[in-house]
Amino acid sequence: MIILTTITVTLLLSSATTAIGAPSSNEDELTIITEDFFPDSLIKYTGAYDIVQLVVPLNALNFAKDSDDSSPESDDGTGVIFFVEAELDDKGNKDYKGLYVLRNGKGTKLLENGRDAVAVNDDSKTVYLAASDGLYVYNYKENKADKYGTLTDNIIDIEKENSSNVLYIVTDKHEVYKVTDEGTKKTKVEKIKNAQQLVLDYSDNIYYYGEDKQPYVINAEGVKKFVGLPENPTSVTLIKPPFVMEDCVPFVSDDKVYYLNANGTSQLSEFQLKVKPTAYGMEAALIDYFAYKKHIYEVNLLAIIVGEIKDFVEVNFLKDKASSIQSIATRSRSGLHP
């Protein structure tokens, strides 16, 4: 349990306070991620298949209570997350098995054909859901998915601008479209070719990688390819960043983790992945989720700092970092609002 928390603390501190412009880690300072980093004591949920997508809403689902909303059961304060299950083959190809919401510790399948989700970063409880037959929106009161808009595309990835109501979707043909007018209009983003995955940072810079598994960023200056990263990697993943990260996203390339900056530069992190999570949910910064071997693990750094988890109180690493973590905790989610 201590080890997995160390991952989260180190990632937060290195990215939120020094990632932009920070030097690469020294090899002597590498943290090697092994199976020991995933203890049973942190398991939040166990699925029937691998969890390949985790989404932690930064809105009223997790940051506020709305007494006007009724729900099938009272919330227990454990947080609401969305996740996708899939059967993975040896090459990492996905046979999707459904999109779920985890609420009050109970997983509910919302869409059999669900692929991804993205939350609105405001005081609503809006979460958009991507499926093989178009878009849906989460109905909090009835804990179900409602059809949204008129699109019928087979969507494998979805993102939303922080500063507007614009959605971006990636189809099964690996084409990217900008979706507007409440899900009724789509415009192809011609500058993005063969997108396999797409992520936005909180300044709405777009990061994606193509068939060659090399990442790109689209900013005010146009499309930039990141240089100096490993060539011909076997597997790569873009991670939705914690909200404290500015103009930067984490990127996993085989067994290494990099920070990709919006200006087209990158830094190697201090992590080497001997084993890798199948999904990451780090948006909330201090309450993070990782998926590994069909389990969802929760790391609650806030609880650690206030001493609710006794085992951590005497750990020198956390005691040394406590003031920095508390500083991160004071950064308001409201800063995300346009």
List each language-model region with its residue ranges.
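Sequence/structural signature of beta-propeller modules
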Residues: 1-80, 86-95, 308-338
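Structural motif
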Residues: 89-101, 133-139, 173-180, 212-219, ...
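A generic tandem-repeat structural signature
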Residues: 99-188
